[in-house]
Amino acid sequence: MKEYSIFYADDDEDDLMFFEEAVYSLSGDEAVKINLHLVKNGENLLEVISQTAANNSVVFMDLNMPAKSGFEHLEDIRSNSLVATTPVIMYSTSADKQNIEKSKKLGANYYAVKPSSFRDVIKLISKALSLDFNTDTAPPNDFLLNKLAI
């Protein structure tokens, strides 16, 4: 059985529930176990990742959160030696090129625009879990994870 840990930081309750349902539908596969850690605004994200991150961990991070933006949380992750190599996917409703480029510049592994359909969220999460972040690096044309998940 393959085991994964997913950390999802978002301040929107509906987005958290939607993502959680998608993860649980994937967890129904007996060959996959997913430990999901929901963080409501990112404030204790570093602490949660530091305490529970393991191999096959990935962070999905919303850009627009109160107090600190997803960009600021990404900078915190990349500057903390305990969690700096944890894969991060910036996960936002925004498809703005500046946000995508800034995410890449700050060290995100991928950027994903939040899909509106449940099926597409499942495909996106599945694609993220299929990546080997130890060897896979996002070439400039493939930084947008949505393109790879279709």
Say what each PLM segment does:
Residues N41, S69-E75:
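Acidic catalytic/metal-coordinating carboxylates
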Residues E3, E72, A95-Y110, A128:
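Alpha4 helix (beta4-alpha4-beta5 surface) of REC/receiver domains from two-component response regulators
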Residues E3-Y24, V59:
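Conserved acidic segment of CheY-like receiver
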Residues M65-P66:
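Receiver (REC) domain active-site loop signature in two-component systems and cognate sites
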Residues K114:
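A Lys-centered signature of the CheY-like receiver
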